[in-house]
Amino acid sequence: MTGFGARLAAAKAQRGPLCVGIDPHPELLRAWDLPTTADGLAAFCDICVEAFAGFAVVKPQVAFFEAYGAAGFAVLERTIAALRSAGVLVLADAKRGDIGTTMAAYAAAWAGDSPLAADAVTASPYLGFGSLRPLLEAAAAHDRGVFVLAATSNPEGATVQRAAFDGRTVAQLVVDQAAVVNRSTNPAGPGYVGVVVGATVLQPPDLSALGGPVLVPGLGVQGGRPEALAGLGGAEPGQLLPAVAREVLRAGPDVAELRGAADRMLDAVAYLDV
């Protein structure tokens, strides 16, 4: 078995350093002349799978699938399976976080043998980084990755993430604890525990010792500029995984237009893996 960090590095080397989001917001479905139903959701995802099958990582935003109940989860399962069949690494943007047996249940769903389990999942550390242990253990056992929220782009996040404890910001504590896991499980790197740092964060945490990947959402519509990402938080070359969704998705529903928009963003961030 090959660890997630190595699989991600290989995918980026072969397909480029970009994560493309599937965010089936109702407004986008309407813009694509699709009904805001589970059938419309399925059609939206089918188009996205065809357009993004050649990229390294695709990130479905789980909340937009949950909104359709069981039918939405069924679409998500099929979408994950189709992307993985095309050789794409799938990052489920679920932002799960809890404690004890509940966290263990989330771990089984998103990092175990469940049909929902993707190659990686996002997680929230608000209940304490240690509460993520069941998820981290399940991910390690199944060669999956975990991206833990550290410093997000939304302005509300700063009140918590930049609060200080023991001389470090909360965001830095999250990064440092992720680094401990990576050093203990794969000291030679790359590790399987990454963090999320928004592209528009003005004071990012120090990422130089993380030893794992950094998901950087917020390019394009949200204000993040590809040319401004180099050296984010002291990250090493190849460590960053920029993510884009709406900037690309608004080019749909034509598959070629979607692929072209994603290719242009990939060209803009390709320098990060040089």
Swiss-Prot record:
Pathway(s) annotated for this protein in UniProt? Pyrimidine metabolism; UMP biosynthesis via de novo pathway; UMP from orotate: step 2/2
Q: Which GO terms describe its molecular function?
A: orotidine-5'-phosphate decarboxylase activity
- The EC number(s) attached to this protein equal 4.1.1.23
Q: Where is the active site?
A: K95
Say which domain of life the source belongs to.
Bacteria
Catalysed reaction(s)?
Answer: orotidine 5'-phosphate + H(+) = UMP + CO2
Which Pfam family, just one, is annotated for this protein? OMPdecase
Q: Which GO terms describe its biological process?
A: 'de novo' pyrimidine nucleobase biosynthetic process; 'de novo' UMP biosynthetic process
Keywords in alphabetical order, please: Decarboxylase, Lyase, Pyrimidine biosynthesis
What family is this protein classified in? Belongs to the OMP decarboxylase family. Type 2 subfamily.
From the Swiss-Prot or TrEMBL record, give the protein name: Orotidine 5'-phosphate decarboxylase
